[in-house]
A protein has these predicted regions:
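Short, structured beta-strand segments at or near domain termini in extracellular proteins/domains
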Residues: 136-149
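Functional-site microenvironments in short loops/helix caps that host divalent-cation chemistry
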Residues: 1-126, 133
Length: 149
């Protein structure tokens, strides 16, 4: 599904694609805490998932345990579109790039990027690149977000 189709679908549901910050905030949660990174074993759990994922088939949607916010499958199932793409991690090199917006894209996924020493949090950042909003892939999806009531 393209970013445009995902965005239109969410709007038709009265929701929107989450921003990168919103996605990361929810992804940082463990099953019991808003910020799972302070929980013993959290980073190891994420690292183990990525280390073993190539050997295992993907799980069905919502078959894993929900995180603190009640959201399932925040890590590793597929790449996900986010609403915003103009972040400092994806803009062009401003000193020599005359067309900063030319290479921007919308795909995203991360555990969180609060602590640079938190290797698990940066693992999915490597996949936040080189995908224009008009493209669609079989491993690329989205989730819609709404304001908390």
């Amino acid at each position: 599904v393209s970013w445009y189709a995902a965005n239109e679908y969410c709007q038709a549901q009265g929701k929107k694609l989450p921003t990168v910050a919103q996605w990361e905030y929810v992804a940082q949660a463990s099953e019991t805490r808003k910020n799972g990174s302070s929980e013993k074993g959290y980073n190891q759990k994420i690292l183990a998932w990525y280390g073993d994922s190539a050997k295992k088939p993907l799980t069905d949607i919502a078959q894993d345990k929900a995180n603190f916010w009640g959201v399932h499958n925040m890590h590793g199932l597929i790449w996900e579109w986010t609403d915003d793409f103009n972040s400092n991690l994806v803009t062009g090199e401003s000193r020599s790039d005359g067309s900063l917006n030319q290479g921007l894209f919308c795909g995203s996924g991360a555990a969180g990027a609060v602590d640079p020493s938190d290797y698990a949090a940066f693992m999915r950042y490597g996949f936040r690149s080189s995908l224009a909003s008009k493209f669609a892939l079989s491993s690329l999806g989205f989730r819609c977000a709404k304001a908390e009531d």
